[in-house]
Design a protein with these regions (language model features):
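Claisen-condensing/thiolase-fold acyl-transfer catalytic domains that form or cleave C-C bonds
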Residues: 4-105
């Protein structure tokens, strides 16, 4: 099963903190995890393939969901081969509210 990840990326540090909080890497290891290429399109955890907040404009919460749905349908521009499950994550304020949506096909 291929897991896709769609994390709210309002700031770079938010991505690093969320990767650690979700258990994709240990506390303090997110920067090395990213530098190792884990989040690239062909990496272990393809990440935010549509660009999201750091590269795309519009309604950020809906963009995360829309790209997750495209990945599950197999219609994404940067399709992750074998994508079967997608975690869509969003947060508000200074990381004090949080929501997670799991999508599957």
């Amino acid at each position: 099963m291929c897991i896709r990840d769609r994390l709210y990326d309002c700031f770079t540090i938010t991505v690093l903190m969320t990767l650690e909080d979700y258990g994709f890497c240990r506390p303090g290891e997110a920067a090395a995890f990213v530098a190792d290429g884990a989040l690239e399109h062909g990496g272990r955890l393809p990440f935010n393939t549509s660009g999201d907040l750091l590269s795309e404009t519009g309604m950020p919460g809906m963009q995360l969901i829309m790209e997750g749905v495209r990945q599950m349908r197999g219609t994404a521009r940067l399709q992750v081969p074998g994508a079967r499950l997608c975690a869509v994550s969003n947060q508000g304020g200074t990381m004090h509210t949080h929501a997670t949506l799991l999508l599957g096909n």
